[in-house]
Design a protein with these regions (language model features):
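Glycine/small-residue-rich loop that forms an oxyanion/phosphate-binding "nest" at active or ligand-binding sites
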Residues: 1-45
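Glycine-rich beta-alpha junction loops
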Residues: 25, 59, 103-107, 126-129, ...
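Conserved phosphate/ATP/ADP-binding segment of small-molecule kinases
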Residues: 33-120
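Short, small-residue alpha-helix embedded
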Residues: 62, 129-153, 157
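Hydrophobic residues at beta-strand termini and immediately following loops
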Residues: 123
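Charged C-terminal helix
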Residues: 154-181
Length: 181
């Protein structure tokens, strides 16, 4: 599948095209079982070709060959977000690339880090008791649509975080399985 996406990008990409890649490979420090090392290498290569990437913390660690457990062991420390910032800065493959690290758990909050070569910021949201299937897809869709429509990346991330925060708060109140989306 990664080869098909590469072919699509190479066929249709123009100078004005924005390519966003959500390098889905794992979560909670673990690689998804369907992913081989070869597939991960291809996804990492795909991410390097993108204008914007939206990895979660596990995927950022895979992209940068960083030890997730070691990094995450600092999650209660005051410098945790700064440590993530340092790792994210090492992930840039070209000067115009932008990185949004999603779903960084710290205390009772989730943070999303927005990184460019020149700047970094974090958007904070309340955590509503765990993960919800599909939120990463919704997040990337809102960010991409907003950026394509001329919004700054930080503004786009704030919009996505606001929507998902409301949606997960409402969903957490319902008696449904979180994997049902």
């Amino acid at each position: 599948q990664v080869d098909i996406i590469f072919d699509f990008i190479n066929t249709f990409r123009k100078s004005s095209t924005i390519v966003l890649v959500d390098p889905v490979m794992g979560d909670n420090g673990r690689l998804y079982s369907a992913f081989s090392n070869e597939t991960c290498k291809k996804v990492c290569s795909l991410a390097r070709s993108a204008d914007i990437i939206t990895p979660n913390l596990t995927e950022l660690c895979i992209l940068t060959d960083t030890d997730f457990e070691e990094l995450n062991s600092h999650c209660e420390n005051d410098d945790f977000l700064e440590r993530i910032s340092d790792v994210a800065k090492s992930a840039f493959s070209h000067s115009e690339q932008k990185i949004v690290v999603t779903g960084i758990k710290k205390g009772n909050y989730l943070y999303n880090g927005v990184f460019t070569k020149q700047d970094c910021s974090f958007v904070k949201a309340e955590c509503h008791g765990g993960s919800f299937s599909g939120t990463g897809d919704i997040f990337a869709s809102i960010v991409f649509a907003s950026v394509v429509n001329g919004e700054s990346l930080v503004s786009a991330v704030k919009k996505a975080v606001s929507f998902i925060e409301k949606a997960t708060a409402d969903t957490a109140k319902e008696p449904y399985d979180r994997n049902d989306g």
